A protein has these predicted regions:
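Edge beta-strand at a domain terminus
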Residues: 121-123, 130-147
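An exposure/low-complexity boundary signal
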Residues: 14, 104-124
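Bacterial Sec-dependent N-terminal signal peptides
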Residues: 1-24
């Protein structure tokens, strides 16, 4: 009887922690993958002190590694893509991140974003969409960078 009680108590303590810990799998270094399956850039996703998540381009893997974001607008216009924060203001929503935006440096456009960790593959499913509900947009699969 004591054993069953201990198992039950442990389940109530550990189960919520497992749910809360899911977005932490998203933190780390990820390769963005183009439509042909090639690596385009290395993005570092981190959690900020205010609880939001962001993604910064650490390295460009194709073309000129020092190129500028010529198609961007505002403060990002003609700034180096390397070092640019392309994912902003993402918040935990269960086992995924939502509510923020993602910048596509190729066209300078900013899209609504959601990010989900795929437990079966270990990949990230990144969706950029025109609408906040994510109905009109496209998906990318990002691969974890191994040191």
């Amino acid at each position: 009887m004591k054993t069953k009680l201990l198992v039950l108590i442990a389940a109530f303590i550990l189960f919520p922690a497992a749910i809360i810990a899911q977005p932490s799998r998203i933190v780390g270094k990820w390769y963005t993958i183009d439509e042909d399956g090639n690596r385009k850039s290395l993005v570092v996703i981190s959690k900020k002190a205010n609880g939001t998540y962001e993604g910064v381009i650490e390295k460009l893997l194709t073309g000129d590694p020092e190129r500028l974001c010529e198609n961007c607008t505002g403060t990002e216009k003609n700034k180096p893509i390397k070092g640019m924060t392309v994912i902003k203001n993402m918040r935990e929503d269960g086992d995924r991140l939502t509510g923020g935006t993602i910048l596509d440096p190729a066209n300078g456009k900013i899209y609504n974003c959601s990010i989900t960790f795929d437990k079966s593959t270990g990949d990230l499913k990144v969706r950029g969409s025109l609408d906040k509900r994510g109905l009109i947009g496209r998906n990318q699969t990002w691969k974890r960078a191994v040191n």
